[in-house]
């Protein structure tokens, strides 16, 4: 970080010559000097060059107005104002969180000024670095010799082997040197929450508006289990979102709890909806408790917020209404909601404490902020027994954490602190909304078909758009007002084939075909439904990437309308079965898969499959214990009616459990089986379109088997 910007506007010798001297002095201190043309050019530079560490400008020309503009972007950036003897400096800077230094235009002062700038730059770096990351950088720079783990010793061991050297060269020396042992006492301990690790947790809690925050190094799958193990002791009953992540199913397999499921909605597109407000009411819960064997009043609730497709809840209503001791919002996909006013009241850490309740929010820092994979956080608001909670934390946390993951978690929080973080999120929101509008424009201008966007008719305001009962765009039935909101950065594109009410069209392009084309061109889709594709506009998505996606979508339309051969348009798919796809054209492939979906009446089938849950014969914990005792057998998928499932069955998409361990598909819930059979049939007819179904195993004959409990194990 060594770039200094000088606004080159002087025009007179007594100003130009001192600046030229300063330029030379700064270069001797290894600064890189750049000269923006004007104010707008400077602001663009600050926006696009994060390594800028200072701005030098003429106070007579720019003064306070420029400072205010810079403050909105980075309130910590050092500013250096040059003034002459007659300049007016009677301004109050008390309200600005700025580092402003004033210098006079004078010859012979360049060395002193350059040293002052170097000192201020060091202070700036020290200010923006969070505590653990700062301590880790310091430790690596000191280059101490250690006789403890890890065995590669800062990368030395790798360089003793040819293949190890290749590995070392790829990842670089700092990655190796920062991979250190928990024996390094000056960095404290992740497990004991001491030293710089404790300071990092306190720092993160302040940034995310939490009472207490924890860094988790094995993803939100682990964070969810930590919260659940503490909040729901064995023998208790919990309320849990049926559209929960599979990690929460694993929690129920590990802990002997009785689940009562919240039942979310879904629309014809297969987009996951929210849990209706009625599900949170005391009377509804009391009825479910009465209907569920061995259930007692729930002590804990788990809600997925946002949904996979970007729907956020009115969390204030849930916190106030839900009568449980603790509420866990699994917010893996929205770690950014604390940094824009459009998310106020729509996330777990919004607002203050809730009397008599503990609110948890787990977030996948790595998913949509800037952190290494597996980086996750737990935020807590309310009173917990920290010693007991830490037992659950240590149960799921390695004693050899990777400090790179831990430091990246803290750095992600530091990036979101203050105006700089707000600017990052606002930039994502603006890019996503602009992309949405471009799709709508191209749809209007295109001949024949084009992609559509799942969103309200008017998106002129920057907000989370509400789903209203008097609107039809969302396709949900009996929606509650002021309950669910669409996050603008989660962009769902619609392909032809299905209307919002579930009516099937004669012409259709299944989204899986578009996803395969995009993958051929280096663009990975987050989630693919029957006729929809989800794209996430995270802070890492820039204008270039958004334009590349637009270009790829228009290229797909052009190639599809030309009816190119599959082997030319989708070469990877062609290689799955060259004989099958040899002479097939893209329109034939699309129409045949579309007809298969129409044949099964997918919208109606999905409604029925998710309307009636399989019967819970035993808890997931009890079913897993029987599996551990070897009391399972495999049967064909077609034979699972009336059998108790041993594992969760989770088709992707949508990526949420369809059948839980210990549940039985009955005649009443047969649509669940029919839905699974339809997914398998598409893959059987068209090589390369097999659905990934966790818990179902494809055999050599192409049929699927599932694991069920042996008949005698029901007792």
Curated annotation (Swiss-Prot):
GO terms for molecular function: guanosine tetraphosphate binding; identical protein binding; lysine decarboxylase activity. It comes from the Bacteria. Its main location: cytoplasm. Its cofactor is pyridoxal 5'-phosphate. Induction: Part of the cadB-cadA operon, which is under the control of the Pcad promoter. Expression is regulated by CadC. Induction occurs under conditions of low pH with excess lysine and anaerobiosis. The global regulator Lrp also has a positive effect on the expression of the cadBA operon when cells are exposed to moderate acidic stress in the presence of lysine. Repressed by H-NS under non-inducing conditions. It is an enzyme of class 4 (lyase). One of its GO terms (biological process) is lysine catabolic process. It holds the Pfam family OKR_DC_1_C. Its EC number is 4.1.1.18. Inhibited by ppGpp, also known as the alarmone. InterPro entries: OKR_de-COase_N, Orn/lys/arg_de-COase, Orn/Lys/Arg_deCO2ase_major_dom, Prn/Lys/Arg_de-COase_C, Prn/Lys/Arg_de-COase_C_sf, PyrdxlP-dep_Trfase, PyrdxlP-dep_Trfase_major, PyrdxlP-dep_Trfase_small. It is found in: Cytoplasm. The modification N6-(pyridoxal phosphate)lysine is found at residue 367. GO terms for cellular component: cytoplasm. It catalyses: L-lysine + H(+) = cadaverine + CO2. The keyword Cytoplasm applies. Keywords: Cytoplasm, Decarboxylase, Lyase, Pyridoxal phosphate. Homodecamer; built of five dimers associated in a 5-fold symmetrical double-ring. Interacts (via C-terminus) with RavA. Inducible lysine decarboxylase that catalyzes the proton-dependent decarboxylation of L-lysine to produce the polyamine cadaverine and carbon dioxide. Plays a role in pH homeostasis by consuming protons and neutralizing the acidic by-products of carbohydrate fermentation. Belongs to the Orn/Lys/Arg decarboxylase class-I family. This is Inducible lysine decarboxylase. It comes from Escherichia coli (strain K12).
